Amino acid sequence: MDGMAPDSVTIRKMLQPLRPRGPDDEGVWQQGPLQFGHRRLSILDLSERGHQPMVDSELAFTIVFNGTIYNFRELREELKGLGYHFTSTGDTEVILKSFHAWGQACVERFAGMFAFALWDQRAKQLHLVRDRMGIKPLYWTQDGKRLLFASTLPALLAAGGVDTQFDPLALHHHFSLHAVVPAPRTLFREVHKMEPAHWKTIHADGLTEQHRYWSLTAQRPVEAKSEWEWAEAGRESLMQA
């Protein structure tokens, strides 16, 4: 946040606790005051083309992504029809192209569990995004000099210099809600969880914007459904899930 280039030691420290979760590959990328790190568990594209942080030089986007987009193949075909070309076979690149094609509305097309950070070089904006139900975690903390984020709390704390004063209300939640602390709180006062179904944008000047892109609705259908129709709707939902 102070415009200074981050040191490489900090990001390496943060990546160390992630090794068991991502044993297949490690990557670090830096541009000016911004630095991304990633530990990879290869599942879809097993080649080096799926390496992260993934950089799209043509679109000027860089991403670190944790999760799975289940309908990425369908989205990739749709994007190909719009003229986009792909160099990898996984879902990470689909997120990059989708953001370029549809902007922040792209997340409404994603079926899956995900948390990602995307840097838009031209707009000088960092986007932090979490899936609808908050299946994939994303922690962050910010002071006057830096913004840190990670997919696990140990990785975030490994950076050092993070304020770890306990949050009394979060402790109350922890002991009364079976060890659950609802987002955006964590046990630590200055460490936060991205809320499910939220999109946060941090501008180069430090201005931050956040909005909820989805909410669960429970509404009665306009027309009554038969037992068979309800069963078919349930089957369709299960198949999609």
Residue locations for each model-derived region?
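Cysteine-centered catalytic environments shared across enzyme families
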Residues: 1-241
